[in-house]
C-alpha cells in the first residue's frame, strides 16, 4: 500500500503528460534529463531525486493547456561575427547546410541567404556584417522542433550563441492570454486618460475600425504600444483573436488565444534578457 502511494505521483505524471499530448522527449528536455531516464522513472525502474521530481512536475505544469497564460519566443535575430556560415550551421544551429535552400540575394543588405521553411540565415563575406539568423513567429516554432529533436532547448541554444560571441539584435517575448484576462480597449482608455503609471513616456493605440462590422463585438481590433517604437524596449498588446479572424477567418469563439502581450527587446536590452 505504501509502495502504491509512493508511485501515485508517477502514475499521475504519466497520465497528465499523455493527456496534454506531450512526448517523453519533450518533457525530458524541458526538465533537463534524458528521455531514457524519464522512461525508467515512468516504468518504475528507477527512483528520481526530489530535485528531479520537482523539475518534472514544474515542467509538466507549464505544458498544461488549461493554463490561462503561456510564454514563448516570437522573434529572434542574432548576428554572429564570422563569415564561416558552415560552422554556424554545424556548431550553433546543429542543422545540415545541404538541406537548406540557398539564394543569391538576401535581406538587410546581405548578398545571399539560406532558408529552410521560415528559418532564415543571411550570409556575407564582409566580417563587419557577419552571419545573421532571423526567426519570425513560424520560424521560432519550426526551430523549436529542431531543438527538441537535438535534445536541446532555447537556453542551450542561446548559451551556444554566447560562446560564439553572438550579438543579439532583437528578441521578442510573447505572453498569450487564453481567457481574456486583459481588456485592451480599457487599457488604452486608461493610458489616454493618464491613469497608467509607467516609466514609459509614450503610448500609441491603433484600432482596425474599417474591418469592424455591426454583428461583431465593439472595440475589437485594438493594438496598444507602450513605449517608443524607436527605443530598445517597448511593449505591444493586441487582440490576437481578432488578428486570426482577419488573417484566417477563424471565428472569435474558436480562437485559442484571446490577447497577446509582447515584450520587444533590441540590442543591449536583448543581450541582458538572455
Model regions and ranges:
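The alpha-helix within a helix-turn-helix
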Residues: 17, 28, 57
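DNA major-groove recognition helix of helix-turn-helix/homeodomain DNA-binding modules
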Residues: 49-65
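Structured, helix-rich domain cores that form ligand/interaction pockets
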Residues: 3-8, 12-19, 62-274
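Short, conserved catalytic or interaction motifs in soluble domains
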Residues: 43
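Short Lys/Arg-rich cationic patches that frequently serve as NLS/NoLS or arginine-rich RNA/DNA-binding motifs
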Residues: 1-3, 32
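Short alpha-helical DNA-recognition segment
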Residues: 21-40
Amino acid at each position: 500500500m505504501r509502495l502504491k502511494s509512493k508511485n501515485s505521483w508517477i502514475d499521475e505524471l504519466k497520465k497528465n503528460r499523455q493527456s496534454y499530448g506531450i512526448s517523453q522527449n519533450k518533457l525530458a528536455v524541458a526538465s533537463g534529463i534524458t528521455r531514457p531516464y524519464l522512461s525508467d522513472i515512468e516504468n518504475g525502474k528507477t527512483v528520481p531525486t526530489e530535485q528531479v521530481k520537482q523539475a518534472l512536475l514544474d515542467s509538466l505544469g507549464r505544458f498544461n493547456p488549461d493554463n490561462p497564460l503561456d510564454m514563448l519566443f516570437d522573434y529572434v535575430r542574432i548576428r554572429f561575427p564570422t563569415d564561416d556560415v558552415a560552422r554556424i550551421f554545424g556548431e550553433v544551429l546543429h542543422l545540415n547546410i545541404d538541406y537548406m535552400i540557398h539564394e543569391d540575394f538576401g535581406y538587410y543588405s546581405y548578398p545571399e541567404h539560406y532558408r529552410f521553411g521560415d528559418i532564415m540565415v543571411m550570409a556575407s563575406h564582409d566580417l563587419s556584417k557577419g552571419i545573421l539568423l532571423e526567426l519570425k513567429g513560424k520560424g521560432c516554432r519550426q526551430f523549436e522542433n529542431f531543438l527538441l529533436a537535438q535534445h536541446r532547448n532555447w537556453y542551450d541554444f542561446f548559451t551556444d550563441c554566447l560562446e560564439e560571441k553572438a550579438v543579439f539584435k532583437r528578441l521578442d517575448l510573447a505572453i498569450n492570454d487564453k481567457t481574456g484576462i486583459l481588456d485592451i480597449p480599457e487599457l488604452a482608455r486608461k493610458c489616454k486618460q493618464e491613469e497608467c503609471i509607467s516609466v514609459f513616456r509614450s503610448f500609441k493605440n491603433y484600432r482596425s475600425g474599417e474591418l469592424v462590422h455591426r454583428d461583431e463585438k465593439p472595440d475589437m481590433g485594438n493594438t496598444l504600444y507602450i513605449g517608443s517604437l524607436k527605443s530598445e524596449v517597448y511593449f505591444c498588446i493586441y487582440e490576437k483573436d481578432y488578428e486570426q479572424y482577419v488573417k484566417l477567418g477563424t471565428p472569435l469563439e474558436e480562437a485559442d488565444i484571446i490577447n497577446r502581450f509582447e515584450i520587444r527587446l533590441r540590442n543591449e536590452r536583448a543581450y541582458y534578457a538572455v
